[in-house]
Amino acid sequence: MTIHRPLACGILVSLLVAPAVAAGGPEVLAEAAGESWLKLVEDGQYALAWQRAAQLLKYELTQAAFVEMTKKARNETGKLVSRKLRSRKLTRQSPSGAPGRCVVIEYDSVFEKRASAVETVIMVAEPDGAWRVAGALIR
């Protein structure tokens, strides 16, 4: 039997790396989805950000209310200068108190009009398996 070393090594590496990737899975997936959503907000695409948010956020705020609040918040802070991950934590309870997977992500951020801020993004796993933003705030 002939064993092709590059193929065998590739399979072995995949088997060793896959559990490590899966171990951080929910938090990493939630963070990626949250950063995509934050990019929409940074680009001023507030209505689209609302459309791509979790049902919980949409239940709490109409699209018009979300757009108005987000514009006001961004006017107060100015444009994003930098953002660095501070923490991300997986919990088993959604912001509404209902059971469900939730990841709370915090960033140390700098804005044009605010030299130091903590952004908190609350991600929930929705029934379709996607991670979506259920809430976001800047302190």
What are these regions (language model features)?
Residues 2-3, 12, 17-45:
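Short, low-complexity N-terminal intrinsically disordered segments enriched in polar/charged residues
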Residues 23-24, 35-38, 53-58, 108-110:
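Second-shell loop/turn segments in exported
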Residues 31-32, 47-100:
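Short solvent-exposed beta->alpha transition segments
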Residues 88-139:
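Exposed beta-sheet edge and beta->alpha loop/turn motif
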Residues 41, 75, 126-128:
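Structural motif
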